Amino acid sequence: MTSFSRILCVIDPTETEQPALARATWLAKRTGAALDLLICYYNEYLGGEWYSDSTSLQKTRADVLEGLRERLEILANPLRADGLVVATTAVWYHPMHQGVARQAIALKSDVVFKDTHHHSALSRSFFTNS
């Protein structure tokens, strides 16, 4: 089996089931790699592009990220109890694929796991999905 030292797993905050996490955990257990859980989040209404980037918007973004970090910790704690080394990160970034790529480079990840979702042809023609 290929040697991995760091695995990045992108968590979808809109879903309860996390198939990518199951696959990343499986690989981390077999290779002894550290596991990084990442939520890369953005909300256009809190982004500050439509309105001025006020102190209240900044606080709201910080609160949202803190809630996402807490969710990541809930996912990470059972994995740590199983002996895995798990780190958690929630970042505010748009577009998501660039945020994931930047985190993968910064963390020196050997492999990235992310769930996929089916989108209809009509949806794909009008929207950019990540």
Predicted regions and their residues:
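Small/aliphatic-rich secondary-structure junction motif
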Residues: M1-S56, R80, A87
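Structural beta-alpha unit
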Residues: M1-T2, N77-V112, H119
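Structural motif corresponding to alpha-helix initiation and N-cap regions
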Residues: Q18, H94-Q98, T128
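Generic structural signal for helix capping and beta-alpha/helix-loop junctions
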Residues: Y45-G47, M96, A121
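Short, hinge-like loop/turn segments at secondary-structure boundaries
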Residues: D53-S56, I105-L107, S130
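A short acidic, glycine-rich active-site loop
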Residues: T55-E70
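Glycine-rich, Arg-bearing micro-motifs that act as flexible, cationic patches
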Residues: V111-S130
